[in-house]
Amino acid sequence: MIVSDNFTSSSNTGADLASSVSENRSHFIAESHYREWVEGSGVAPEIARLNVRSLSGMTPYEYLLYSDEPALRRNDGRLRDTWLKRYAFVEHGGWWCSGIDIKTGKDSLWGCFKGDRPRKDREDKKPIKYEHPPRVATEIFTLKVDRGTWRKIAKRHKVELPETDQGFWEWVLAHPELPIIITEGAKKAGALLTAGYCAIGLPGIYNGYRTPKNDHGEPMRQLRHLIPELDLLAKNNRAIAFCFDQDKKPKTIKAVNGAIQTTGALLEKAGAKVSVITWHQDAKGVDDLIVEHGAKALHNRYKHRKPLAVWEMDNLTDITTQVDLTVDQRYLDIDPRAIPKDAQIIFIKSAKGTGKTEWLGKIVKLAQDDCARVLVLTHRIQLAKELARRLDIDHISELDSSPTGGALGMAMCIDSLHPDSQAHFNFMEWHGAHIVLDEIEQVLGHALGSSTCTQDRAKILETFYNLILYALRTGGKLYCSDADLSPISYELIKYILDGCEFKPFTILNTYKPCLEQQRDLFFYEGNDPRDLLTNLRQAIENGEKTLVFTAAQKTASTYSTQNLESLFREKYPDKRILRIDAESVAEPGHPAYGCIDSLNAILPLYDIVLCSPAVETGVSIDIKDHFDSVWGMGSGVQTVNGFCQGLERLRDNVPRHVWIPKFSPHSNRIANGGYTAKAIARDQHRYAELTHKLIGEHAAECSGLEDSLKPFLWAYCRYAALANRGFGSYREAILNKLLSEGYVQKDLSEIDPALAKDYRDELKAVKDHNYLQERVAISKVENPDDRQYEKLKRQRAKSETERHQERHGKLSRSYGLTVTPELVEKDDDGWYSQLQLEYYLTVGKAFCSARDRAKYDQLQHEGFVFKPDINRRSLSPKIHLLELLNIHQFLKPGVTFTGASLEGFKENCLRYAKPIKWILGRTITDKMSPLEIAQALLGKLDRKLEYKGRFGSRDNRQRVYEAIAPNDQREKVFAHWLQRDQAKLGAVSNPCINRFIQEA
């Protein structure tokens, strides 16, 4: 049976050898081919008839082998025998599909052939399903569209049909407001068009871009670019969504994800807004999804498509390929017998509030019944104490007073996991132990990046490495649980145990507590949380009891716990208010002192509770029917997971109100701010290598310990990349995460902008007053002597006066200046690091290498230094680069500059643009003027050029800027530092340094 119509394609300019084919391409389809497209893939009959035809005999050769390259044809134009033999299978027939060339608007010669009896791949012997013309550039499938489908697409996207006889794809190009879906293959493109979407098909997942090669045949990835057809479409902020197959093979998933990331990045660079469509149904391709579940399923998934950056984050945290057991339980209640006896590493991913810790408690009890000791490692002292209580073991601080003395096990913070800590930890004492890493993502992230671990990080990582190996080799087990468990922690543990026969077992609990009862989410936009503050105050005035989470505690931040407390105490004197932050929980006499252990007993006593990230993780607030709402204000300091963790501390199902900035400030980004682990690792290695060269060869020596601990550096880079991606699309990422956890976004009622501004201004006035009072108090308090100062630094519990004393002592010793309110503010703004750069660039240059060597020696353990730590602390690479950029020219008062006089400076900076980015954290582009570049770099030293005016002849007037000497007492600071460094280095036998000291 033949299905045909009277359509005949128009003539098409192209290769002469294919012209006759182009003129005679009538559309006729065999019944089997028609059913494959229409019934099997859900393509409209009209689209199938316009784009597909059945071929057999010699005709397919003319469609496929039209290239005029000598490799294909002899001098007389005839196809070479090798090609005829290779493609002999086409004579058995098949279907051909081709559409429109959007570059010309005419029919495309290029297309795809699917043989009824396909040839096999010479390597893997699998049938090659789809054939594309060889020795010609690949294109995309932009299928011809009938008027009915066109009308359907126009209606869906609310774009008017053209009155003139304009082609469909010309219409699409002319309307960038029309979104486009990219899929793989012609049939899927046809199915999407039929469903009412502008869709194009790639012949393969990697065919959206091209990678040039150098003379040696090596790919030049930095020169990758979109194919011309995609470049045409990716303009003017057009929305483009990927809709590739949802495969289950790990290797294929990795390939598809890589293709989306690369193509998506190029599309965004070209001006498109990129997203990704995913689904959980068994349907592999989008045509399967439509045929099996209907177009509504596609509409639903399109509605819930994820921005590229958010999808990349989800992709980095997806563990589905590692899962051994999937359950759907409100509270984890897995029979221990369901876990294989030989499984020594158990990973658990289960949502917040699903009883992970309670289930671990049962496991711990079974281990103790078998006479195995249990070691619980956490990232926070309070959490360690809480877990010790819940798991019925000792906290490390209780060993001396406990009747069991740690015989059953203990809980401790990972900061103490090394022999030189107060715990004097010895991994050899944990023979056959069961180790629990509750909230493993937080624990490992803390071990790898927390400033509290910096001094001993090399020892901590070595001990952790040895502990895991020793415990498991002696029959122990490792339990790793987290609501946000990612492949990063999973693979780090695997790397530690590389070469060992330890079997992992991964449990995934798919239950989402927010779905049990609908949890409402009110999500606020805007550049600041004034609208949220307005509704919060309204809720308080209406009698609601509110739990408020904010990212800051200090008075220097407008929306901090301290400033909100002051405002609310003034406005609502009848309300019972509790502030919980790092200072209040450690301040004797404060109502929040030591409250973390008993929140469920304390919080019901209050109407308004204000929390900082001190209550971000490790706390479960289980009280019911007390709080009416939860309010969250982020500033971009917390990670995406960290912010969402805070919102979930209260288990009760009450509405959540959330405001966060669109993007996190660049100052919060980790390492070089990169979005890929490879980029971060590359720059970490470069920085460390440069430091080694600049401070002396002895620092480059390392033991075999570095090889053993390489997996930790790679994990650090992966965690950093994940966090940076979240920071780069902060608002989108947090909203997506909350919605994926089951929250339901609700519409906000209209807010009076004038009232919101008044409320914001009131809080800002409170902040200005509080911040000034605090700075004055710090400046007026007595400067502690050295003994008192050291005691204050070690002291955990401190009164407000003691905190001010410690800060005063630090400022006095750091700057050598009289402590004033102005100095406190400058220090808060990062003045110390700015002056430090200028000091070692100028008068202190002779001491820079010695300083960095001392830092290296402090951090090293058996010749090993964790590179991110030494990179954060070493200044030599920064100083070296600033010298290469000739920054000294701007430090001479009275010297003037114009854009023209700094052209050479700009060229030099552009030459070093990449090192400027990963060493100084500044982005330099060709679009910046020379003076803009100079000001950006001088900002690193808290300096700037002063504008003097426009001078010169009428035809050549130029803006003139002058270098000025800052009037901020920095010379006194430098003199203080010079005296300090001379005293430290006076006894060092180094001719260069000794000569400098004598000259100084």
From Swiss-Prot:
- CDD domains per the UniProt record, alphabetical: TOPRIM_primases
Q: Does the keyword Oxidoreductase apply?
A: no
Region annotation (Disordered) maps to 787-812
**Keyword Cytoplasm recorded:** no
Protein keywords: Plasmid
List compositional bias (Basic and acidic residues) regions by residue number: 787-809
| UniProt protein name | Uncharacterized protein SYNPCC7002_B0001
Origin species: Picosynechococcus sp. (strain ATCC 27264 / PCC 7002 / PR-6) (Agmenellum quadruplicatum)
Q: What's the source species' lineage?
A: Bacteria, Bacillati, Cyanobacteriota, Cyanophyceae, Oscillatoriophycideae
